[in-house]
Amino acid sequence: MSQNKQQISTTEGKLCATVNFNWFLKDAEKFENGTRSEPVPATFKALVNGKEAFEELHDRIENAQHSIDIAIWGFQPSMHFKRDGKSPCIGDLLIQKALEGKKVRILVWSLPGNIQTFSEANLGNKPGVWLKDKVEGVTSEQVDYDRWWYEAIQGELDEVIVNAKTDGIVHVWEAHEIEKHEKLVEFTKSPKRTNLIYKNRKVAPQNEDFKPRILPDGRKVNHSFKDTELPDGKGTLTDGSYDFALKKFKSHHQKTVLIDYEDPDLAVGFVLEHNMVDNYWDDSNHSLKTTLPNKGKNSPTPLQDVSSIVTGQVLWDINHNFCQSWDRQNNKQWGKDPVDIGITGKRQSFTRDHYQPNPSLVDDSKLVMAQIVRTYDQPNIEDIMKVYLKNIKQTTSYIYTENQYFRFPPLVREFISHWETIKNNGRTEGPIHWFTVTNSSDEGIGAGTYTTNEMFKLLGRQEVMPGVAREIKREELGVELGKCKVNQAILYNLAIRSPTSGERAALEEKYEANEQEIKRIEKEIANIDLKQRKAEIKQAEQKTQNNENIQHPNAIENQELSQEEANLTKELGYEISDTPGIKAHICTLMPKDENGKYVHTYKKNGKDTPAEVYVHSKVTIMDDVFTIISSANLNTRSMQVDTELGIIMECADVAEGLRKRLWDLHTNKNFAANPDDMHDYAVAEEAFRKWGELIKANKRAQKGNGVAKCALREFYRAAPSVSKSD
């Protein structure tokens, strides 16, 4: 076996920590008080999917004794965290805690004028939002409640009631509806109302990210991002390129909750991936079946996500991050009460040593060494990216990535460079195995098919998104063709003006060679166009056979790949290694129908509609030792633009335990595809083979209208549309 082979992690004392590789970040950010982000004693418990995460949140908030600090991307007051048909929504629960005298702070991302709500319903029905009922499954009663909740917490709901009663019979009805919400009416008049403070937070511009630079290969790019292949644009809204989206639409994407920070013996924290919006509530069954919003899943889109609850010294870091954001001068506090700032000073007497890990506070939690890492705007911190780029060079067996996006090409480039080094140093094992679960739907993949294609190209897997791959290659050839035609005109003019026959002959030779290059490129473009038309015709025929509406192409249909497509990256002329060091399964997840069967499509308005679980997770596990759970997606936005926060651990119990739990869901408890000891290369190799069998079996089942055996489905996206905003 190779000298690079990693051994299984061991423990030191009671804390789970490895003794060979160091998976933590040594050069993490340094804080104002001289300390820095570092691995510290903690407890950790993963919370898989919304039911588990939100019920835990509800119970902890309900039992809070001192304070509740929430930092979140999306907040909907009418959302029910605990869906037993009797528990209050989060808006009422937080009001109740404020009435009890507990301090409640809510920090939610928003852009000036709430302009993000044109497309993102992240504020519920807050007064001033642009889309009133964006989330499918949200009831009109919830929409009304949201608006009244925001009026209540700023002390103006009683005025709304009075005005409604005097504005005619139609508005009298509204007044009566408001008065049914006794908690809102009580709260808006209570002197304890100021115990609940709500702020919106924006992200500071990072102008240094957009300074032009010259790369070592001589190319000029208009940014300083790690991904040097980002498509440059004109920086306009209509251009649709990354530079406008990343410059103008930065988001505060962190998701944390702190309970009772002022009492270290009681304090717990949450590092979340879930947002506090209805469509993030789902259970691990991922059924298409829906019900009332206080009794179960009410959003029609199944959603996969992972959060966590922690104790110990990591709470100090989570609090530091929260206070730093809460006390910013450019936050917008809701209402007219005096602005609540200075929480940093009020808590400065607490140090990490006050917060010892306490397993008794959280059942089934693990004692670990853990480190909080983040992406941040002021100061400019990019530690989550550093962790990924560092640790991918330490993996020796496998990587598991469950992420909303799979498009950070520098991660693959970093590993490919590392692979050459370890091969030269005598590694005898084959490529590592990258198991990936992500999204292929329009909603899930978002506006980033260009960088997703770049990721697939580096992995030699462009066949799973062939339309985009061909379209991008066509664009590249178009640029080449334009340059050749300009050169042709230059050569022609030089030739006819050449003073000697020798010079003229040389220029004519160059002209002829350039002419042949033009013909080659034009032929290649025509060939790409022909193959894309054939693919579209084949897809249309399949949809007709399946009684699908041809006017609504199935963007995620997993077609049987032709031999040509299986070698698409090479066919398109890209130079890739036959042994890049990584073998990748790139998968999406199928939901279940009302009968508990995995389905590729479902009926919506009488038509077959593609069925895909929306993967919102941001989890990566390496070699059954390293784990990161965070708010950060695998893209440039999360690594270098938005604010993000995550927790990293090097602990076999946590890594293997979480990996096995997630794979139990995705493989339908197939032990052969979800074995113990994946740190062992031979075991990972066999598991990779078994995943391949499951994927092929599900593909055959789809083709023959059979029943899939598990949720795993090979990523496939036929649509050729290229998006460059992320």
Q: What role is predicted for each listed range?
A:
Residues 2-726:
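Charged, low-complexity intrinsically disordered terminal segments
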